[in-house]
Design a protein with these regions (language model features):
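Class I S-adenosyl-L-methionine-dependent methyltransferase catalytic core
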Residues: 1-195
């Protein structure tokens, strides 16, 4: 346990797909002028340096975000791809690709005042990175060193009764697959209108 480090995999093809969907769901929730919560059960470090030893050792980002990064200025780029690339470009000041946002960073960039981001992470190194990354953020972010699977039922439904739950464990343990299903069932029982 705790051998998984997302820095090796940040920006890979699976991250790109997951984050395209996340940005689209967030954009949909933002259409209503009502606050909502984002709960990330396995937040990771929040932000990843693609020039780090982790990222360059695996090189996985090259087949993911590295492959579509040139499309940010291309005509005809699909809307979902463009929306994600715009978020990543804002983080990189529109220039070279160095920083890749994890789900917490993407959500933080998009949320409004009154919305809330709850981040759960159990990994001792990742929680430190997450806390460091969000150290200057005083509004609307809570970070908990807890098992996101067991924490989720305790915080549902969120106070505004609108929310998005993001569940993406490292699948380091075989029972993570079973725990995802159990968490989804528990979430559905506690908050039938959640996303």
């Amino acid at each position: 346990m705790f051998s998984y480090r997302h820095g090796f995999h940040a920006g890979n093809h699976a991250d790109v797909l997951k984050h395209m969907v996340l940005v689209q769901v967030l954009e949909h929730l933002l259409q209503k002028d009502k606050p909502f919560w984002v709960i990330d059960t396995h937040a990771g470090g929040g932000l990843y340096d693609l020039t780090s030893n982790y990222a360059t050792k695996s090189g996985e980002f090259e087949g993911g975000i590295g492959r579509i990064w040139p499309l940010r200025k291309a005509a005809g780029t699909p809307v979902a791809v463009k929306a994600l690339l715009d978020q990543i470009a804002a983080l990189n000041n529109g220039t070279d690709l160095r920083w890749y946002p994890g789900s917490p960073q993407l959500a933080a960039q998009m949320l409004r005042q009154g919305d809330h981001l709850r981040l759960c992470e159990l990994h001792p190194t990742e929680i430190g990175l997450l806390r460091d990354h969000f150290a200057g953020v005083k509004r609307g972010v809570s970070i908990e060193q807890v098992d996101g699977f067991t924490d989720l039922p305790k915080v549902l439904p969120p106070p505004p009764r609108r929310g998005l739950v993001h569940i993406d464990p490292p699948y380091e343990l075989k029972d993570d697959y079973k725990k995802v299903l159990q968490a989804l069932r528990a979430a559905r029982e506690r908050s039938a209108t959640g996303t």
